[in-house]
């Protein structure tokens, strides 16, 4: 009985896929990073001829692009907010330059379709963009070798100081005049034997 249900499920999935009811617009990669900026891609169906694409940052309209066809198939593009964009047959890409952590937020693409009729409004895709500060990473890259070199130098200096101090302490304890042991002078054995011969 289970193989029957799995076959029915696979068959229904293939029918949805072939008829285009499966919406793959939300499965695209929305954010990509280029040269210190962020590219936000909003996809739409290729059959759309006239559209209005809006990029929302939370509830604020950040970018607004309208593509219409006039007489003689002339394409008119209006970009009242002067957002840098790139338009293709099935997507609009908006560019946010000099991305920093203050631009991290929830972004949403909203599509209004004028042609082909009927008029439709869709929220296509959304995602949360979190930008980490890259300057902190660069500072860490600089300070990491400097910190390691300073640590090695301090360790080397400490070892040299300990060895020097140990040698100094050893030398001072050997020649200490206040020691209870007296230094013995070297005795010449030849003189000793002569003295021994005189007494006998």
From Swiss-Prot:
InterPro entries assigned: ICOS (IPR039943), Ig-like_fold (IPR013783), Ig_V-set (IPR013106)
S-S bridge residues: 42-109, 63-83
Extracellular-side segments: 21-145
Up-regulation conditions: Expression on T-cells is drastically induced by phorbol myristate acetate (PMA) and Ca-ionophore or the engagement of CD3 and CD28.
Glycan-modified residues: 89, 123
One of the protein's GO biological processes: T cell tolerance induction
Pfam families with a match to the protein in the record: V-set_2
Quaternary structure (record): Homodimer; disulfide-linked. Interacts with ICOSLG. Interacts with PIK3R1. Interacts with TBK1; this interaction is critical for the maturation of T follicular regulatory cells.
Protein name: Inducible T-cell costimulator
Source species of the chain: Rattus norvegicus
Organism lineage: Eukaryota, Metazoa, Chordata, Craniata, Vertebrata
Gene: Icos
């Amino acid at each position: 009985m289970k193989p029957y249900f799995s076959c029915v499920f696979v068959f229904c999935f293939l029918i949805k896929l072939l008829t285009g009811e499966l919406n793959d617009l939300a499965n695209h990669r929305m954010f990509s990073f280029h040269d210190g900026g962020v590219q936000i891609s909003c996809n739409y169906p290729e059959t759309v001829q006239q559209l209005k694409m809006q990029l929302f940052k939370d509830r604020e309209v950040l970018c607004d692009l309208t593509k219409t066809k006039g007489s003689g198939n002339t394409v008119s593009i209006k970009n009242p907010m002067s957002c840098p964009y790139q338009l293709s047959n099935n997507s609009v890409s908006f560019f946010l330059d000099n991305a920093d952590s203050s631009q991290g937020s929830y972004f949403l693409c909203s599509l209004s379709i004028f042609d082909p009729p009927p008029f439709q409004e869709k929220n296509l895709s959304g995602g949360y963009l979190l930008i980490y500060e890259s300057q902190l990473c660069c500072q860490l890259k600089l300070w990491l070798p400097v910190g390691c070199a300073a640590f090695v130098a301090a360790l080397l200096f400490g070892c040299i100081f300990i060895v020097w101090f140990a040698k100094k302490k050893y030398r001072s304890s050997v020649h200490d005049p206040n020691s209870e042991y007296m230094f013995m002078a070297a005795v010449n054995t030849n003189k000793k034997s002569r003295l021994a011969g005189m007494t006998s």
